[in-house]
């Protein structure tokens, strides 16, 4: 059951289907990003890949600005989008250098009254002030400024627990749902959390891990960052859909810059799976540098940003899954690393070895091999191949 509007009408789900961008920073000519799944429906996961300074954050900010409640630090740009429910609604937004902005055509429509976008930048830090002192009403502000903090997750959890103990029914449901999220595996090794009060009446949250109980502020930064934005998102969904049996399963749009930031490789492999399970009706549009993120997803809409001298072009492959690709194949073909997946030292030694073979110079080949032998993986099959190649040059013994 979704949140009711004042006139008792339920706002329909609204998602992005396309984004057209022109003359925005590194994007010069008009280009359109398809945000659908190829079958006319919005893709649940769109992943934007590109080198540093190729416009990943710019694209997320362009999308965020279409939530008319959030206009922070505008820059001149022209972009348009289609918002989808049962039909497409197209709007064109112009933001000038002066800071003024306007929609060039009709934007607001009762059919998209429920459109709210949640955005999270790379500095996903929890606020340390109390909830009553500082409430960030702009749901995408951290995308525009690293100084913007997210909800004080620990205090929100403590306040919710206090409300539960005072018999607030809605609080009990919310606490149960956020516990389900945080112990679902989205935080590796975290199996539970509890509320603790010291003798001097200071309260805090302790997370149960394989290594014992750990306070939230003592967890690694990847854990703190994940708790910060996931709890922030959950709180906003609880408030947006107060009448829903499960607000976390309601429609929303979430933008995350560098979703793999501070996550170790195994965590990167599973993060999409966990977020999809906990927020099944959310459209995620995220940027990433991780081939593991690309490899792990079952059905993704991939956006590749490719630098071309003084501008960036947008390319979208037809494939929707890369689960059968190796990490090296993703790095080579999608992230354009080529031989850069190997160290410069390795490449130089291989070149030296090959040149020695061509010149039939055993001494130089042996010198290159000895250095390669030190840096190759202990179980590398290449070591045996190099020895076989070198044996053809081995001096005959009498």
What does each of the following model-derived ranges do?
Residues 2-7, 58-113:
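Conserved P-loop NTP-binding catalytic core
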Residues 2-15, 109, 277, 292-398:
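RecA-like P-loop NTPase motor core
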């Amino acid at each position: 059951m979704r949140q009711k509007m004042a006139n008792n009408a339920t706002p329909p789900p609204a998602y992005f289907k396309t984004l057209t961008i022109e003359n925005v920073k590194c994007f010069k000519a008009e280009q359109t990003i398809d945000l659908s799944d190829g079958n006319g429906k919005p893709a649940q996961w769109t992943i934007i890949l590109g080198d540093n300074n190729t416009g990943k954050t710019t694209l997320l900010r362009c999308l965020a600005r279409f939530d008319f409640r959030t206009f922070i630090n505008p820059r001149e740009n022209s972009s348009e989008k289609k918002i989808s429910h049962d039909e497409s609604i197209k709007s064109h937004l112009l933001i000038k250098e002066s800071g003024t902005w306007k929609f060039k055509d009709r934007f607001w429509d009762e059919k998209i009254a429920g459109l709210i976008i949640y955005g999270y930048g790379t500095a996903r830090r929890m606020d340390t002030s109390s909830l009553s002192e500082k409430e960030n009403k702009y749901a995408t502000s951290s995308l525009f400024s690293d100084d913007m903090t997210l909800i004080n997750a620990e205090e929100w959890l403590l306040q919710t627990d206090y409300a539960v103990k005072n018999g607030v029914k809605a609080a009990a449901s919310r606490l149960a749902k956020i516990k389900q999220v945080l112990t679902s595996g989205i935080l590796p090794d975290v199996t539970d959390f509890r509320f603790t009060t010291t003798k001097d009446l200071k309260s805090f949250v302790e997370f149960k891990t394989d290594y014992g109980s750990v306070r939230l502020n003592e967890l690694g930064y990847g854990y703190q960052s994940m708790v910060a934005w996931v709890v922030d998102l959950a709180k906003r969904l609880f408030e947006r859909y107060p009448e829903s049996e499960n607000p976390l399963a309601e429609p929303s749009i979430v933008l995350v810059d560098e979703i793999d930031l501070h996550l170790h490789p195994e965590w990167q492999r599973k993060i999409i799976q966990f977020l999809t399970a906990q927020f099944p009706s959310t459209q995620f549009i995220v940027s990433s540098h991780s081939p593991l993120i690309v490899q792990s997803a079952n059905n993704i809409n991939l956006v590749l940003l490719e630098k071309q001298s003084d501008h960036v072009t947008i390319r979208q492959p037809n494939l929707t899954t890369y689960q059968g690709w190796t990490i090296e194949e993703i790095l080579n073909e999608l992230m354009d690393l080529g031989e850069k997946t190997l160290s410069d030292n390795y490449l130089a030694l291989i070149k030296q070895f090959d040149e020695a073979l061509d010149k039939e110079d055993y001494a130089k080949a042996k010198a290159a091999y000895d250095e390669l032998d030190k840096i190759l993986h202990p179980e590398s099959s290449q070591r045996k191949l190099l020895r076989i190649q070198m044996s053809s040059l081995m001096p005959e013994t009498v």
